[in-house]
Amino acid sequence: MPYTKKKPIIIVDGSLYLYRSYFTFQNFNSNEENPSGAIYGMLKTIQNILNKNYNSKKIIIIFDSSKKNFRNTIFKEYKSNRSAMPNKLYVQIQPLFKILEEIGIKTLSILGIEADDIIGSLAYKLEQKGEQVLIVSHDKDMIQLITDNINVLNISKNSILTPEKIQEKYGIYPKEFIDLLALMGDSSDNIPGVPKIGIKTALFLLKKFSNIKNIYNNIEKIQSLPFRNAKNAAIQLKNYKKTAFLSYQLAKIKLDVPINITSEEITLKKTCFKKLSNLIRWYSFNE
């Protein structure tokens, strides 16, 4: 069971786990008027997070807002491949927020700001204050935020991602993951990337040139490099330069969103664990 020796502040990717909870417990409650599977799933997820990180006393859960953000402005197709939120999930959101408030767990969403940007900005701000941060998410976008003081917990795989683990797996630094997504694209967010540039080619180029800016500064050298289809890759990069840099803007998580959260707001009260357990038990009995 992974846990960190210090006491990190936990930032949960609430939108991600809200959807996951909804689909996992879609048939949890057959009551058409008051579905509760997403609520139950979120409470179980929070309990699991706190059990795995029992030495942490500060937690905040971040959610997307319904309003579009700057990425939709610069690229209208951003996330356009995603279906609208199911109504059975939508009706559980406000009740969930009220329940979390009763328990004493802080939530945050900001109109027109994507959850990823809130998470990144808050994590960066806390790191600047000397805090250790643990982001709970299995979204690959979060990899770019990883530092010695900001780690990412994937509760499904029971693993904590660190800079060393990212370098071991990909051979690049976490911050270069933005460039990786810019080159190869990201179908889940509908980020285009450069067509026909896959992960192997992208990683080869980043290991040699570090970032897309440096790749384009050395664009004439690429066709002669020792990797498969180097000539075709060079042509694709030249033809889709604007798309590559647009994709970089879409993939890069903002670190400068103004966030005013006090330490007291995110500190768990002693009654939190009991309230959480009681609610989970109540939902289990009333399923």
Swiss-Prot record:
Keywords for this protein: DNA-binding, Exonuclease, Hydrolase, Nuclease
5'-3' exonuclease domain: residues covered: 172-270
GO MF annotation list: 5'-3' exonuclease activity; 5'-flap endonuclease activity; DNA binding
UniProt cross-references to SUPFAM superfamilies, sorted A to Z: 5' to 3' exonuclease, C-terminal subdomain (SSF47807), PIN domain-like (SSF88723)
EC identifiers of the protein: 3.1.11.-
Keyword match Protein transport: no
SMART domains: 53EXOc (SM00475), HhH2 (SM00279)
InterPro entries membership: 5-3_exonucl_a-hlix_arch_N (IPR020046), 5-3_exonuclease (IPR002421), 5-3_exonuclease_C_sf (IPR036279), DNA_polI_H3TH (IPR020045), FEN (IPR038969), HhH2 (IPR008918), PIN-like_dom_sf (IPR029060)
Gene3D superfamilies per record: 5' to 3' exonuclease, C-terminal subdomain (1.10.150.20), 5'-nuclease (3.40.50.1010)
Gene Ontology biological-process annotations: DNA replication, Okazaki fragment processing
Protein task: 5'-3' exonuclease acting preferentially on double-stranded DNA.
PANTHER family (alphabetical): 5'-3' EXONUCLEASE FAMILY PROTEIN, FLAP ENDONUCLEASE XNI
Stated name of the protein: 5'-3' exonuclease
Source species of the chain: Buchnera aphidicola subsp. Schizaphis graminum (strain Sg)
Lineage of origin: Bacteria, Pseudomonadati, Pseudomonadota, Gammaproteobacteria, Enterobacterales
